């Protein structure tokens, strides 16, 4: 099972240049927000309404070098990455607004 992280192409490109991805939420909240495939649509509506330029990162939890914790939010467990996202854990990217 993969988990997803929604970001902008610019933030993802910066992470690729850096060699690891660090979303601004990591310094603000201490973790990177993620979702399951089933949570994607609600996450887009709740947090990304009106934003057109988005990219979804597909992440293999088994390859994470940072801790992954499942924590309750909005009445259900969401995956949170507690540290930088190592690039080799990202198995692919896609436009989250396009049907798959």
Task: Label every PLM stretch briefly.
Residues 1-100:
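Conserved, structured core segments of small domains
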């Amino acid at each position: 099972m993969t988990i997803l992280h929604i970001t902008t192409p610019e933030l993802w490109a910066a992470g690729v240049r850096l060699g690891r991805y660090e979303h601004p939420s990591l310094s603000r909240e201490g973790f990177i927000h993620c979702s399951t495939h089933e949570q994607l649509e609600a996450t887009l509506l709740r947090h990304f309404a009106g934003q057109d330029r988005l990219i979804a990162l597909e992440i293999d939890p088994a390859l994470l070098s940072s801790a992954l914790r499942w924590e309750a939010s909005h009445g259900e467990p969401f995956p949170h990455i507690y540290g930088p996202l190592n690039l080799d854990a990202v198995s692919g990217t896609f436009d989250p607004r396009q049907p798959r």
